[in-house]
Amino acid sequence: MDATELKLVLDDHVLWLSNVGGKRADLREADLRGVNLGGADLRRADLRRADLGGADLDFSCLPLWCGGLNFKIDEKIAKQLMYHVLNLMIYSEIEIPTTPQTLVEFANRIHRSDVEMLSLKGV
């Protein structure tokens, strides 16, 4: 997907989010490595199996639904996401799991029953 096509998809997505036409962004399996998505509103966009390695996600909005699972990120994005999660947990006085296993167990207590449980198998 080139920059022009991506801009059209994101512009249509904003219209769709505002209920004034457009359509939901379908970015499944998209190669978005190194793309500047800063400020992009990706709520409810489908990012499954997309590759966002090296993408700039500053001031963007990632979806918190199943379409926002199973896409690739790089270490920079992982650190940024982890920073935000830990900041909110500390601020909210939520106990932070201290081992990878207890972290997975904590995450698997998600309020949804229709998502696949996480596992450290193969890590």
Q: Would you name each region that the model predicts?
A:
Residues 1-33, 38, 43-44, 48-123:
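Intrinsic low-complexity/IDR segments
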